[in-house]
Amino acid sequence: MITYGSGDLLRADTEALVNTVNCVGVMGKGIALQFKRRYPEMFTAYEKACKRGEVTIGKMFVVDTGQLDGPKHIINFPTKKHWRAPSKLAYIDAGLIDLIRVIRELNIASVAVPPLGVGNGGLDWEDVEQRLVSAFQQLPDVDAVIYPPSGGSRAIEGVEGLRMTWGRAVILEAMRRYLQQRRAMEPWEDPAGISHLEIQKLMYFANEADPDLALDFTPGRYGPYSERVRHLLQGMEGAFTVGLGDGTARVLANQPISLTTKGTDAITDYLATDAAADRVSAAVDTVLRVIEGFEGPYGVELLASTHWVATREGAKEPATAAAAVRKWTKRKGRIYSDDRIGVALDRILMTA
């Protein structure tokens, strides 16, 4: 799946990060300099490889970070021969062939890619973007996050006149009431707000309760994921909610998103006056009943993932459900035991 990112690529929540480099061992400006400062051991390995003549056009130079938390691989993509020379589209074409090979061979599930050869390289973004999209269409199961050259944090536009809608109301009311319920069940969790991961799972169950929300969930790295939910949150950021920022924070950082005073007032007024208020409350009631006892990022991810394999893949027996959840990603296989998945499955079947 191809999506677009903004802000700091080095904070992208992906297994691999792509860095643009030359073939002479210099990382003196742009994103390459940021990588050099963030990963000095990677730079040392790259510099030595250049001296040995191992960094060439059309060949990725991959460095494993050795980190348990954060990106596992830095993929150095040569976009020019010398740092003084311009990039060429032929270099991008050759490199993308090898990048796809590397992603397949290393079984990389997600990757963040900068605007290759644009900016200091002198290439036109439209030409490069077309090539990136074409290349990653070969890998439909890989989450490819493409960063356009504009970069920077997302500007919050038009928030003063933001109108409450049914979809926004469901998110806000689910957030408000879930936070109250989570405080009672998991008092050690952040009291200020709830994470994007948790909101995604709340809205997954809301969509199950009322399919007219049409949120179009797909199997993501951390369970069912909806790009539309993210867009709804981004649209409310700075007005009804605060904490998402530009959306580039790592998912597992569990950065808290909370209702603003304006958001609290808006949802209170909506529920008191709008004809759809009962429908909003009914959807949220169902969500909170289903997830009771599974509050927190770990629990709601487990419950939503188990629900997905039970309803989409027909895994309604404990053994098959456990196998399906644990093979979803290596991470799920590490953190979720068969017993815990079985408990989640019991809840799903009980509330069906």
Swiss-Prot record:
Q: Which GO terms describe its molecular function?
A: ADP-ribosyl-[dinitrogen reductase] hydrolase activity
Record-level GO BP terms = DNA damage response; purine nucleoside metabolic process
Q: Name one Pfam family in it.
A: Macro
Tell me what this protein is used for: As expression of DarT is bactericidal (rather than bacteriostatic as are most TA systems in this bacteria), inactivation of DarG may be an attractive drug target.
Q: Which domain of life is it from?
A: Bacteria
Report the record's disulfide bonds. Answer: none
Which residues, if any, are the signal sequence?
Answer: none
Summarize induction of expression. Answer: Part of the dnaB-darT-darG operon.
Q: Which phenotype arises from disrupting this gene?
A: Cells lacking this gene display impaired growth. A double darT-darG deletion shows no change in growth in culture, upon infection of mice, or upon exposure to a variety of stresses. Another group finds the double knockout gives a competitive advantage over wild-type cells in liquid culture growth experiments. Knock-down of darG expression leads to increased RecA expression, ADP-ribosylation of OriC and growth arrest.
Checking SMART domains in the record gives: A1pp
Chemical reaction(s) catalysed: an N-(ADP-alpha-D-ribosyl)-thymidine in DNA + H2O = a thymidine in DNA + ADP-D-ribose
Keywords, in A-Z order? Hydrolase, Toxin-antitoxin system
Q: What Enzyme Commission number(s) apply to this enzyme?
A: 3.2.2.-
The free-text domain remark for this protein reads: The N-terminus macro domain alone is sufficient to neutralize DarT from non-cognate T.aquaticus in E.coli, DarT in M.bovis, and to de-ADP-ribosylate DNA in vitro. The C-terminus is a region interacting with the DarT toxin ssDNA binding region.
Q: Give the family this protein belongs to, as stated in its UniProt record.
A: Belongs to the DarG ADP-ribosyl glycohydrolase family.
Subunit structure comment from the entry: Interacts (via C-terminus) with cognate toxin DarT; this heterodimeric complex neutralizes the toxic effect of DarT by preventing ssDNA binding to DarT and consequently inactivating the toxin by direct protein-protein interactions. Co-immunoprecipitates with a number proteins known to be involved in DNA metabolism, in the presence and absence of darT; includes alkA, dnaB, dnaE1, dnaG, dus, embR, mtrA, nrdE, nrdR, polA, recA, recB, recF, xerD, Rv2258c.
**Annotated protein name in UniProt:** DNA ADP-ribosyl glycohydrolase
Q: Which organism is it from?
A: Mycobacterium tuberculosis (strain ATCC 25618 / H37Rv)
